Swiss-Prot record:
GO CC terms, sorted: apical plasma membrane; extracellular region; extracellular space
Matching Pfam families: IGFBP, Thyroglobulin_1
Location relative to the cell: Secreted
Phylogenetic placement of the source organism: Eukaryota, Metazoa, Chordata, Craniata, Vertebrata
Main localization (coarse): secreted
Name of the protein in its database record: Insulin-like growth factor-binding protein 2
CDD domains, A to Z: TY
Originating species: Mus musculus (Mouse)
Signal peptide (from-to): 1-34
Domain observations: The C-terminus is required for IGF-binding and growth inhibition.
SUPFAM superfamilies, A to Z: Growth factor receptor domain, Thyroglobulin type-1 domain
């Protein structure tokens, strides 16, 4: 069994960590061998040296950056937000979509998940039967072995692993399509029983529209080879939207090949890059450039008047 991620053992552990796409929330049951569909490249000494010093703030636990990053960050604790772009949950926790989420996968992509204690004793079928909103389960991030689950909703004990990445992605695509079908049925039901109370859905923001396009592309993605779905997912830019549907100031590519992704600053309404802001592998401090842009725009408006 591997020791916990953190402390002096961290550089020795990173080269052996794997990024897995599994069925089941939090790993496989007894006697079931997990199928490796995508393996993160090893963290070379050069990549580790580029990380710099560990976080200044005291951390209860250090974990790897999201994706295939090699640098260490503070783990999120129970009750804190989690998702694709947000640091991983602590070792004993898992990232789940909030109860009642209409699109659990989308909630996790946008960082609207919550770190919770691992849910035990629930099979994927039981989750689907008890609540359609949870049919996609949670994005599980195991910070000892790097496991990520984008499909399962509970324990996978007794469940046979899929034998090909194509089958894995087919199940994934079907679950995404099922969400859209369920939403359509709900809208028809409301229109028949409560025509007076039915309100038109709010207009989708540019960030939400871009995210919809990415999710649609994922739902129709095909595997031309045996590299696995995660490698194709890393080639996509998933927009980072806030809870109001606006672009977050900082947008980043996912970490890959042991190197953190590039980050840049955008206008929260349009998603267009802020002029003068850098594109770096780190924090470009977007709030400074956005505030400067706002002040410049306000001064220009006053001069025109």
């Amino acid at each position: 069994m591997l020791p916990r991620l953190g402390g002096p053992a961290l550089p020795l552990l990173l080269p052996s960590l794997l990024l897995l796409l599994l069925l089941g929330a939090g790993g496989c049951g007894p006697g079931v061998r997990a199928e490796v569909l995508f393996r993160c490249p090893p963290c070379t000494p050069e990549r580790l040296a580029a990380c710099g010093p560990p976080p200044d703030a005291p951390c209860a636990e250090l974990v790897r950056e999201p994706g295939c990053g090699c640098c260490s960050v503070c783990a999120r604790q129970e009750g804190e937000a989690c998702g694709v772009y947000i640091p991983r949950c602590a070792q004993t926790l898992r990232c789940y979509p909030n109860p009642g989420s209409e699109l659990p996968l989308k909630a996790l992509v946008t960082g609207a998940g919550t770190c919770e204690k691992r849910r035990v004793g629930t099979t994927p079928q039981q989750v689907a039967d008890s609540d359609d909103d949870h049919s996609e389960g949670g994005l599980v991030e195991n910070h000892v072995d790097g496991t990520m689950n984008m499909l399962g909703g509970g324990s996978s004990a007794g469940r046979k692993p899929l034998k090909s990445g194509m089958k894995e992605l087919a199940v994934f695509r079907e679950k995404v399509n099922e969400q859209h079908r369920q939403m359509g049925k709900g809208a028809k039901h409301l229109s028949l029983e409560e025509p007076k109370k039915l309100r038109p859905p709010p207009a989708r923001t540019p960030c939400q529209q871009e995210l919809d396009q990415v999710l649609e592309r994922i739902s129709t993605m095909r595997l031309p080879d045996d590299r696995g779905p995660l490698e194709h997912l890393y080639s996509l830019h998933i927009p980072n939207c806030d809870k109001h549907g606006r672009y977050n100031l900082k947008q980043c590519k996912m970490s890959l090949n042991g190197q953190r992704g590039e980050c840049w600053c955008v206008n929260p309404n349009t998603g267009k890059p802020i002029q003068g802001a850098p594109t770096i592998r780190g924090d470009p401090e977007c709030h400074l450039f956005y505030n400067e842009q706002q002040e410049t725009g306000g001064a220009h408006a006053q001069s025109v008047q």
